[in-house]
C-alpha cells in the first residue's frame, strides 16, 4: 500500500475504476498562521522578476562553495541554514510542539538543523497536524528553484502531504482549497510528496487540472469509468528516473525542484526535479511520453484496461494572467491520523517495526531564480 495512493490519489484497478479519498490536507492544527494571515502580502516587496533577468552560467553552488556568501547572491530569494536559529521564516518565530531548531551532530552542515516531529499520541489528540514553517519569497518570480537537504529518520510513516510551493497574485492563498480547481487568474500550487515506498511525486492543483471521476479526466456523468461523484484532488506526477527501491532513510538527501509558469495562453509550464544533483524527471512540453488516466499521468504508459497509447506530455497551462507568479514556500510535514495508522500497519505487515513518531530533518534551504545545486 503506497502512501501516495492510500492518501488521496485514486488508485485504478485493472478495469480503470478507483477508490476515492475524502480528505486532502484538511484544516489542520498548524504551527503558524495560514498564508492568508494579515500582512503576508503587504506592500514593500521588490518588483516581480521577469524571464528577461539574465541568469549567470553554472550552478549557484559553484560560485559559492560551502554556500559561502550564497545568501547575498542577487539570484537568491530565501536562504536558511538554521545556524542563527529562527527569524528567517514568516512563521513560526520560535520552537513549537512539532518544530525545533537544534544543535545536532548529524546536521548536514554547520552545527544546527530544523527537526519536524509529529507523534502518534499527538495525532490521537488532533487528527490533522501540519508542522509547517512558511515564508513569502522576497519577490514573486516566473521561474523558481528550491534546494534543501532532508533526512527521514528511522522507519516511520511519511507525511500525508509534504512540501508545498504556491504561486498566485497578491491576494491568493493556497490554504484550505482541497478538492477545488483554483482560478487561473488567481493562483495554483503543488506539493512534493514522499510515498511509503520512499519515492517522490508532484501533486498539483491548477485551473486545467483533471478530475478523478472519469477515465479521460473529465467529470461528465455517464463517462467511461464513471465513479459516480465529481472530485478534484491533486494530479499526480511521479518523476520516472528515481533510484530503484527509493531514497535511503537515515541519510541526508539533496532535493532540488524547478518550477516554471507558462506563457499566458500556452501550455509551456514545467516541473522538474533533481535528487543528489541527478535529474530524475521533467514534466513539460513534449516530455515525458506517457498516458493520462483519471487524475494521474503515467510516464511510459500504464497497463490498466482503460489506458490509452502513450503520447508526449502536453505541458502545463498553470495560469491565465501574468501576475500569477511563484511567491510562497511551505516546509510542511502534514499528517492525518487515518493515513498515518494505515501506513504504520502496512509497515508492520512487511515485517518492520515502525516508530511511534515521524521525524524529518532539514538543513540548507535555498530558493533562487537559478539552478542551485547541492551544498558541497
PLM regions with names:
Residues 67-68, 132-138, 239-246:
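Beta-strand-rich interaction surfaces with strong enrichment in secreted/lumenal proteins
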Residues 107-231, 358-361, 366-375:
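Secretory/extracellular carbohydrate-interaction modules
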Amino acid at each position: 500500500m503506497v502512501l501516495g495512493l492510500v492518501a488521496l490519489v485514486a488508485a485504478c484497478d485493472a478495469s480503470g475504476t478507483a477508490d476515492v479519498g475524502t480528505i486532502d490536507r484538511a484544516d489542520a492544527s498548524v504551527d503558524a498562521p495560514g498564508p492568508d494571515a494579515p500582512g503576508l502580502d503587504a506592500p514593500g516587496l521588490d518588483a516581480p522578476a521577469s524571464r528577461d533577468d539574465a541568469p549567470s552560467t553554472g550552478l549557484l553552488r559553484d560560485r559559492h562553495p560551502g554556500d559561502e556568501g550564497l545568501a547575498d547572491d542577487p539570484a537568491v530569494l530565501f536562504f536558511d541554514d538554521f545556524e542563527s536559529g529562527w527569524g528567517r521564516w514568516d512563521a513560526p518565530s520560535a520552537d513549537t510542539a512539532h518544530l525545533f531548531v537544534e544543535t545536532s551532530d548529524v546536521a548536514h552542515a554547520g552545527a544546527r538543523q530544523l527537526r519536524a516531529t509529529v507523534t502518534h499520541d499527538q495525532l490521537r489528540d488532533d487528527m490533522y497536524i501540519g508542522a509547517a514553517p512558511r515564508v513569502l519569497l522576497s519577490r514573486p518570480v516566473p521561474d523558481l528553484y528550491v534546494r534543501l537537504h532532508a533526512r527521514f529518520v528511522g522507519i516511520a510513516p511519511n507525511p500525508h502531504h509534504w512540501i508545498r510551493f504556491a504561486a498566485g497574485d497578491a491576494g491568493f492563498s493556497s490554504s484550505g482549497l482541497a478538492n477545488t480547481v483554483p482560478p487561473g487568474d488567481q493562483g495554483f500550487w503543488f506539493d512534493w510528496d514522499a510515498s511509503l515506498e520512499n519515492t517522490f511525486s508532484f501533486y498539483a492543483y491548477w485551473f486545467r487540472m483533471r478530475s478523478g471521476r472519469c477515465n479521460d479526466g473529465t467529470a461528465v456523468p455517464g463517462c467511461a469509468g464513471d465513479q459516480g461523484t465529481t472530485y478534484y484532488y491533486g494530479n499526480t506526477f511521479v518523476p520516472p528516473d528515481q533510484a530503484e527501491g527509493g531514497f535511503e532513510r537515515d541519510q541526508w538527501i539533496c532535493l532540488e525542484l524547478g518550477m516554471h509558469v507558462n506563457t499566458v495562453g500556452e501550455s509551456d509550464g514545467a516541473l522538474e526535479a533533481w535528487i543528489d544533483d541527478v535529474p530524475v524527471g521533467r514534466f513539460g512540453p513534449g516530455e515525458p511520453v506517457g498516458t493520462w488516466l483519471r487524475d494521474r499521468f503515467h510516464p511510459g504508459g500504464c497497463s490498466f484496461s482503460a489506458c490509452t497509447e502513450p503520447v508526449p506530455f502536453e505541458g502545463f497551462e498553470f495560469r491565465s494572467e501574468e501576475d500569477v507568479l511563484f511567491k510562497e514556500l511551505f516546509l510542511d510535514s502534514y499528517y492525518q491520523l487515518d493515513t498515518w495508522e494505515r501506513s504504520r500497519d502496512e509497515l508492520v505487515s512487511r515485517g518492520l517495526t515502525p516508530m511511534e513518531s515521524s521525524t524529518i530533518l532539514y538543513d540548507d534551504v535555498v530558493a533562487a531564480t537559478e539552478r542551485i545545486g547541492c551544498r558541497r
